[in-house]
Amino acid sequence: MRLNAKSRLFAIRRNSIHELGIVVHISKTLEELAQENNITDIRRVTLQIGKVSGIVPEYLVDCWQYYKKKVPLIDNSTLEYEWIEAITICNECKKTYDTIQYGRECPYCKSEHTVLLQGNECLIKEIEAE
C-alpha cells in the first residue's frame, strides 16, 4: 500500500478531529487578538489544559503543526501547554478533592452531590509575539 503525504495528514486529522477543531478555534481567537493589538507574528502560544477536558495534548500539537502552515500569523509558532488539575467540590460537606483520584463520589462524606470546579477547560495563558 502506498501512502502519500496527503493521506497521512488525513489520518492524523481523522484520529484527532476534536483537537483540530480546538486548534482552529484558537487560531481564530489569535487572529482577532493580533488585529486588535497590531501583531503580525506569533512565536509561541501557551495553553492551560484541564486534566479531564478530553483533550489529548499529543494530538493537539500534531494538529497545530498541520494547521499553522495555513495561517501566516502562526506559521513560525510553537505550541506549549500546562495542565490544570481537576478539582471537585462536594455540595454536602463543602470540601474539595482531586477528581481524578476519587471521581464523582466525595471521599469525605461519600455524597455524589458534587460539582467539578476546574479541570475541563482549555485556556490561552500566554502569547509571545513580535
Per-range role (PLM):
Residues 88, 104, 122:
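Cys/His-enriched microdomains
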Residues 90-93, 106-109:
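Short cysteine-rich clusters marking metal-coordination/redox-active sites
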Residues 98, 111-115:
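Short functional micro-motifs and their immediate structural scaffolds
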Residues 114-126:
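Short metal-binding segments enriched for Cys and/or His
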